[in-house]
UniProtKB/Swiss-Prot annotation:
Origin organism lineage: Eukaryota, Metazoa, Chordata, Craniata, Vertebrata
Catalytic activity: a 1,2-diacyl-sn-glycero-3-phospho-(1D-myo-inositol) + ATP = a 1,2-diacyl-sn-glycero-3-phospho-(1D-myo-inositol 4-phosphate) + ADP + H(+)
Name of this protein: Phosphatidylinositol 4-kinase type 2-alpha
Domain PI3K/PI4K catalytic: start-end pairs: 124-453
Residues annotated to bind ATP: 131-137, 152, 261-264, 346
EC top class named in words: transferase
Posttranslational modification: Palmitoylated by ZDHHC3 and ZDHHC7 in the CCPCC motif. Palmitoylation is cholesterol-dependent, and required for TGN localization.
Length: 479
């Protein structure tokens, strides 16, 4: 996708100077004649004694041999410096191009993390593949080796042609009729991840780690053999023939587009904590915190119609109070209230273009939890109802999602309208459930609704919508 974005224009393809700008990171070998070579490259000072214009007849034979050797060393170092300069210039231009793509002026904190990841990759601290899951995903690190984000490339998704997980390839080969989810748009998982973060921020839920679309290239990503051979060939050409290598649009591996989600520390799988809370019940105030956080997860999953929400792909962070059993009676101990938070990750299988109606229903597994039987609290009503009841807010949300989704090369406007129709129906059901004081369990039992834009031959200032219920149910229904 990046073959058409030249890194070095033909006008800039002249051989570079031998001297480097400060901070380029290049170092010249300390060899005899180095100072003479730099002076000659700069075009200042008299010609060295071994230059062709010097009267060699007056030199002793030993000095002539030394001069010829120094000239040969100077030429070798000059060629090496020229290759290093060309490589540094191309690399700097490539980094600048990636940074222009990965520009997030509206979120400077997120941009700082992306810059840290880019610098780490330049320093050969590459992302590490995550072996769990059904797609190619990677822990992205900073220059200190700390995990700062999770990157999921588009072409390594479960339906991508470069998915490194052989189990999905085997499933696609042996059982194609059961492969994939026909209610989802193929190869848009990275947009679904970023879209879930967008919805989370618009609704002020604050449970999805910030996620955006980012371009990254790394040796540890899964590339085709052709891409790797082309990259090695271009690098070899740049080293051997810098004039030719400078004319390539790109030297390294092609950058991959994908979702870049900030890494959250101190969280564990919800299944771990939920089992522990069954054995060790939480205090009343802490249990109230968990319930409020759980309601935010329900709101997010229901609006985006997440088709892959189990208890193993959302996280809980529980900061237990200080254990003062080992403290003496005379010690003063600061007792703090336990803090519990929820993080909704793995949102790549959301935003369907229709409600599931084929084989599987893809239920919300949190609906079987005890927290799902408690009616929605007044706090979540005050937070969500004013927003989702406002047509202007819904319209702004749709426009923001459109600006995000249209970045995909395979974007289809008709499919996007279907995705939005499903989301409108989910918002309609959620609004009614909150007003009727229902519980999350009652919410998921409501009939699926699709709200489409009504077609009219007359122009009007406001849009009208048509509401329809889905009567067809999946073969394996869960109610």
């Amino acid at each position: 996708m990046d073959e058409t974005s030249p890194l070095v224009s033909p006008e800039r393809a002249q051989p570079p100077e031998y001297t480097f700008p400060s901070g380029s990171g290049a170092h010249f070998p300390q060899v005899p004649g180095g100072a003479v070579r730099v002076a000659a490259a700069a075009g200042s000072g008299p010609s060295p004694p071994c230059s062709p214009g010097h009267d060699r007849e007056r030199q002793p034979l030993l000095d002539r041999a030394r001069g010829a050797a120094a000239q040969g060393q100077t030429h070798t170092v000059a060629v090496q410096a020229q290759a290093l300069a060309a490589q540094a210039a191309v690399a700097a231009h490539a980094v600048q191009t990636h940074r222009e793509r990965n520009d997030f002026p509206e979120d400077p904190e997120f941009e700082v993390v992306v810059r840290q990841a880019e610098v780490a990759i330049e320093c050969s601290i590459y992302p590490e593949r995550i072996y769990q899951g059904s797609s190619g995903s990677y822990f992205v690190k900073d220059s200190q080796g700390r995990i700062v984000a999770v990157f999921k490339p588009k072409n390594e998704e479960p339906y991508g042609h470069l998915n490194p997980k052989w189990t999905k390839w085997l499933q696609k080969l042996c059982c194609p009729c059961c492969f994939g989810r026909d209610c989802l748009v193929l190869n848009q998982g990275y947009l679904s991840e970023a879209g879930a973060s967008l919805v989370d921020q618009k609704l002020e839920l604050n449970i999805v780690p910030r996620t955006k679309v980012v371009y990254l290239a790394s040796e540890t990503f899964n590339y085709s053999a052709i891409d790797r051979v082309k990259s090695r060939g271009k690098r070899l050409a740049l080293e051997k023939v810098p004039k030719v290598g400078q004319r390539f649009n790109r030297i390294g591996l092609p950058p991959k587009v994908g979702s870049f989600q900030l890494f959250v520390e101190g969280y564990k799988d919800a299944d771990y904590w939920l089992r522990r809370f069954e054995a060790e019940p939480l205090p009343e105030n802490t249990n109230r915190q968990l319930l409020l956080q759980f309601e935010r997860l329900v709101v997010l999953d229901y609006i985006i119609r997440n088709t892959d929400r189990g208890n193993d792909n959302w996280l809980i962070k529980y900061d237990c109070p200080m254990d003062n059993s080992s403290c003496r009676d005379t010690d003063w101990v600061m007792v703090r209230e336990p803090v519990i938070k929820v993080a909704a990750i793995d949102n790549g299988l959301a935003f369907p273009l229709k409600h599931p109606d084929s084989w599987r229903a893809y239920p919300f597994y949190w609906a079987w939890l005890p927290q799902a039987k408690v009616p929605f609290s007044q706090e979540i009503k005050d937070l969500i109802l004013p927003k989702i009841s406002d047509p202007n807010f819904i319209k702004d949300l749709e426009e923001d999602l459109y600006e995000l989704f249209k970045r995909d090369p395979g974007f289809d406007r008709g499919q996007f309208h279907k995705q939005i129709a499903v989301m409108r129906g989910q918002i309609l059901n959620l609004t009614q459930a909150l007003k009727d004081n229902k519980s999350p369990l009652h919410l998921v039992q409501m009939p699926p609704v699709i709200v489409e834009t009504a077609r009219s031959h007359q122009r009007s200032a406001s849009e009208s919508y048509t509401q329809s219920f889905q009567s067809r149910k999946p073969f394996f229904s869960w109610w």
